[in-house]
Amino acid sequence: MPLASGLLTGKFNKDSSFAPDDHSNYNINGDAFDVGETFSGVNFNKALEAVDELKNILPEGITLSQLSLKWILMHDAVSIVIPGAKNKDHVSLNTSSSELDNISSLMNEINSVYTKYFFDDVHHRW
């Protein structure tokens, strides 16, 4: 789940809600399901804080989705990411992330956000 069920697209905020029968609502605390499922096993509200920090370092002209996917692709152990997409515009945006070359300078800041919000909760699972 490279975009953490949409969390790393920036489409959710603290006012977002889910239907009672929506699996997102069921796993809003990040403790249900198996590793890597809804919200990648991270508490929804905690992840929103991370998203806010990432938005603050987002370069002009780059979406949060693109930044997130490129960050994954910049790890030596990763050769491909398979994100979800609901339409052809999402596909185009997602594939264009591999062509970004101007985020190397942000890696330390992105890694810091990952460490602060996600590392303890999920890193040991991978």
Task: Enumerate the language-model features and the residues they cover.
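Glycine/threonine-rich phosphate-binding loop and adjacent beta-strand/alpha-helix elements that clamp
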Residues: 67
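Glycine-rich beta-alpha junction loops
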Residues: 1-12, 71, 87
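Terminal-tail/helix-coil boundary detector
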Residues: 16, 20-56, 60, 74-79, ...
